[in-house]
Amino acid sequence: MERLQGLLLWLLLSPSVVWASRGPLRPLCRPVNATLAAENEFCPVCITFTTSICAGYCPSMVRVLPAALPPVPQPVCTYRELRFASVRLPGCPPGVDPIVSFPVALSCRCGPCRLSSSDCGGPRTQPMTCDLPHLPGLLLF
């Protein structure tokens, strides 16, 4: 009987193992281009710019049966290596710093979410937009 249960378990799992080995249905964690908005409440315009961010699927596990154990931490797609770039907001009055710095993803990894450096929320239904009048283009340096 034990042998039969083992065979049944193998038959149930083997098609999913073969299917799963063909690759994930979602793109894995990697740098992707994204358009972001930069503004300062003291400057008259908002600008958008394109940078690399980390995005994609990270394999995770969820307990099927309720347990007294704490939940399994879910990994998120986050920076492995990054550099910082800056944009200059035009039209800022004297005494207001017109420079906005932002991270540029060079490589990514799946790991724990660090709220100090990442937005660990899920995908947004609305893109981040400007509250101020929008000035297209970018001034990177």
Curated annotation (Swiss-Prot):
Q: Does the keyword Secreted apply?
A: yes
Q: Which GO terms describe its cellular component?
A: cytoplasm; extracellular space
The cellular location(s) given in this protein's UniProt record come to:
Secreted
Q: Cross-referenced SUPFAM superfamilies, in alphabetical order?
A: Cystine-knot cytokines
Which residues bear sugar attachments? 33
Tell me where the signal peptide lies: 1-20
Q: What is its main location?
A: secreted
Q: Where are the transmembrane segments?
A: none
Which PROSITE patterns did the record assign? GLYCO_HORMONE_BETA_1, GLYCO_HORMONE_BETA_2
At the top level, the lineage of the source is Eukaryota
UniProt keyword annotations, A-Z: Disulfide bond, Glycoprotein, Hormone, Secreted, Signal
Q: Name one GO biological process term.
A: luteinizing hormone signaling pathway involved in ovarian follicle development
List the InterPro entries hit by this protein, alphabetically: Cystine-knot_cytokine (IPR029034), Glyco_hormone_CN (IPR006208), Gonadotropin_bsu (IPR001545), Gonadotropin_bsu_CS (IPR018245)
The role this protein plays is:
Promotes spermatogenesis and ovulation by stimulating the testes and ovaries to synthesize steroids.
PANTHER family (UniProt xref): GLYCOPROTEIN HORMONE BETA CHAIN (PTHR11515), LUTROPIN SUBUNIT BETA (PTHR11515:SF11)
Which family is it part of?
Belongs to the glycoprotein hormones subunit beta family.
Any idea what this protein is called? Lutropin subunit beta
Q: Which gene encodes it?
A: Lhb
